[in-house]
Amino acid sequence: MNPAHLLVLSAVCVSLLGASSIPPQPLHLIQFGNMIQCTVPGFLSWIKYADYGCYCGAGGSGTPVDKLDRCCQVHDNCYTQAQKLPACSSIMDSPYVKIYSYDCSERTVTCKADNDECAAFICNCDRVAAHCFAASPYNNNNYNIDTTTRC
C-alpha cells in the first residue's frame, strides 16, 4: 500500500477514535504520526505533513521548498539508508512497517534501548524528523503544491 494512502487511512482511524493523544499503536506509520504529535502537539497535527512541499508524503524529488520540506528529504534519505542495512533486510524490517519502542515526554522523543539494530535505526530516522518538524515553520503555501512545476 502506498505510504501516503496508509497515512490517510491512519488519520481516519485515529479520527474515529476521537482522541487527541493516542499511545503508540502497533503500526509504524501511526508510531511516526504519534512522534510528530509529541513534538508538535495538536489534534492530528501530523496530517498536515502528508502532502507538503516536494518531499513530505509519498515519494520526493527536486529541491526542497523550505526547511520543513528539507526535514522530509532527510527523512526519506534516512529510510533509504535503513533499507540498505543488513539488519533491515527482511520485508518485516521495512521502514514502513517496522515496529519500534520509544517514549514521549515533554515534547521530546526518545528511542528505547530495547530496539534491535534495525528498529533503532528507523526509530532514530523518525525521531530526528519529528524534532526537525517541530523546529521548522509551516508555510500553508507549500501544502498540496504542484510538484511537477515546483520541484
From Swiss-Prot:
Residues 22-27 form a propeptide. GO terms for cellular component: extracellular region. Its main location: secreted. GO terms for molecular function: calcium ion binding; calcium-dependent phospholipase A2 activity; phospholipid binding; signaling receptor binding; toxin activity. InterPro entries: PLipase_A2, PLipase_A2_Asp_AS, PLipase_A2_dom, PLipase_A2_dom_sf, PLipase_A2_His_AS. It is an enzyme of class 3 (hydrolase). This is Acidic phospholipase A2 1.
